[in-house]
């Protein structure tokens, strides 16, 4: 690698809106995020299946059980 052309890669603090913080490495000193593995529904197991406006039922009525 050439000297002086690459950004400094140092320790960084990641802060989530839920209050969770953790350390990683980045070219930035602080990273703010809206969602992390501590509050994301996929990782917490609080995932909900949302059927918006009965689209599944409407599909089944229209095309039947294939």
Curated annotation (Swiss-Prot):
Pfam families: Ribosomal_L31. One of its GO terms (molecular function) is rRNA binding. GO terms for biological process: translation. Zn(2+) binds at residues 16, 18, 36, 39. Gene3D superfamilies: Ribosomal protein L31. Binds the 23S rRNA. Part of the 50S ribosomal subunit. This is Large ribosomal subunit protein bL31. It comes from Pelobacter propionicus (strain DSM 2379 / NBRC 103807 / OttBd1). The gene is rpmE.
């Amino acid at each position: 690698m050439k000297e002086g052309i690459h950004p400094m890669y140092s320790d960084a603090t990641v802060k989530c809106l839920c209050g969770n913080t953790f350390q990683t490495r980045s070219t930035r000193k602080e990273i703010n995020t809206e969602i992390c593995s501590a509050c994301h529904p996929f990782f917490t197991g609080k995932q909900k299946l949302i059927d918006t406006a009965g689209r599944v039922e409407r599909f089944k009525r229209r095309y039947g059980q294939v």
